[in-house]
């Protein structure tokens, strides 16, 4: 069972990942690194994704490798409704703390 905090905590990297997933619906790890313009590093993105999945912010599934690419299946990530709410709460809080963000 996923443990869900009463007040979601959302470190900046997790907020960035949720923003990217909401823009694209679903992505795999290396797509997130590329879309973040290197703000996410290959070495930490999968640790962060695992932590986010434990918190219930995202879900993942294995997707078969494309036939032309060969290789291993890829893990694809998508935001959950709980993750969307956590991001909305985080964004609201950030705008309260820094009014310039509301513009």
Feature map (PLM): residue ranges:
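N-terminal helix-turn-helix DNA-binding core of bacterial DNA-binding proteins
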Residues: 7-46
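Beta-hairpin "wing" of winged helix-turn-helix
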Residues: 55-70, 78
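Short beta-strand/turn micro-motifs at beta-sheet edges
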Residues: 4-7, 64-66
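Amphipathic alpha-helical dimerization/coiled-coil segments
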Residues: 1-2, 82-103
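Short secondary-structure boundary/capping segments
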Residues: 9, 50, 67-69
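Basic amphipathic alpha-helical segments that dock to polyanions
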Residues: 45-55
